[in-house]
Amino acid sequence: MTSLVSRESFSLENYHKVAWLGESVEISDSAIAKIDGARSGFLSLLESDDDIVIYGVTSGYGQNAYQRFDKEQRQAHAGKVSFATSAAFGDPAPERLVRGIVFARLVNFIEGHAAVSSDLVGRVAAMLDEDRLPPVPTRGIGCAGEIQPLGHLFNHLSQERVMGVKENLALVNGSPCASALAADVALSARRRLDLAYRFFALSIEALRAPLEACDPSLDLLWTAPEELRALQQLRDLTLGGDPDRRSFQAPVSWRIVPRVLAQAEHTVGRLESVAESSLSSITDNPVYIPPDADNPLGRVFSTGGYHNGLAYPAIDGATASWADLATLGDRQITKLLDSKVSHLPDQLLAKEDGYIGVAGMAAVAYQEEARRAAQVTLLPGSEGGGFGQNDIGAPTFWSFNQYGTAGRALDAVLAYLGVTASQALHVTDRSAPPALIEFLEAIRSMVPPVTDSRALGPEVEILAEQISKAVVSASSTADLEVL
């Protein structure tokens, strides 16, 4: 069980424990005291001034923000459930992501900035003990902020208890979805990148590519830490390989592998940083600031915290990296099959009828899927369904969906790259470097070397699916299992 004490409890590591590993959470006694103290201070502030303006508490929502409520109207307004926000449908979020949103929702509560009761906080935390959470669509989300997905997730709580002033609003405001989306992508991207290293290292060995592209002397010439990490990873994976290398340089698609993997390292690192900062940020609107010397009852004001402007560009960065890696993989598959370039048996034929050349045709289609998904995510160009104040939507779910498409496409290309590299080693009777022996065995357990013509598609699909499963597995690392 993960104990939540303060904002510092909302780390990417704890996100992984709760969202991916299924841990429950416990609100610490000190946090409960702070939550209850903030709730009391907020209510005192509300009672102290009949003319105070607090969005969604003494005023209406959205285009009705101009409306003002007296004390009786405030409580009636607080009890209303906005079922209208549950307008989206399509592609429900995976359970791990929904759990992540619930976890991220709690950060606004933990130090009292949402000014809700500890009872409500306990109800939200208890959702993480349930076997199934309400479905949250990932398509059709075009709202300002995150009222649509959060309405799908939390509206049932508003029916199960009497909600106090501001409590309904605190459930659906802020940007916990963006925090969870960034965290989910960061975790899966790190695992997918780890697998990509192994596939490209296997391809380097398959071609007998000179290892100068990863030469240790480059550590003194290049300065970006991501580049140095990529160089070291590739050196570790290819160590002990065939000493008989090509005597001339490999095609560009092999020589730039360290640089392109370094680009991916950079984008994944940025994602991890954005996820960490987003998870621990207070994003409620309106937000409550506890009492200080100048404001003995605290103060409340409106913010734009519901719009995370860092998450979707960071997710886009990973998507673009997957597209670039898919392009490298496509090029390498084609070159491995072409004896004029690879100096391997033409088309990697083990026998006359063991043709696998169509692999390149499939790969180019999958890499094109990744490239198309890498279109940059921008703020929506139309107000669309925005009314009054709600005139800009948050595009984070769109970037997440594009990332998923590009990731699955890259997995397909990596699967075909692994199969092609495996075939190259088979027809030349070579083994993989020590660090890749088990990895090659896993590939061959799903797609054995081709000795007679057969339909590769169904087998490679299994391998691609195993890659996709590995990147979201509960394990701390992504590994292919021998089937």
Question: Model-predicted segments: where are they?
Answer:
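Acidic, glycine-rich active-site loops and adjacent beta-strand->loop/helix elements
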Residues: 61, 107-108, 128, 142, ...
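Alpha-helical scaffold/interaction cores of sigma-54-like transcription cofactors
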Residues: 1-48, 66, 78-136, 141-142
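Metabolite-binding pocket within alpha/beta catalytic cores that recognizes anionic/polar moieties
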Residues: 51-53
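FAD-binding core of FAD-dependent oxidoreductases
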Residues: 55-109, 135-157, 163-180, 311, ...
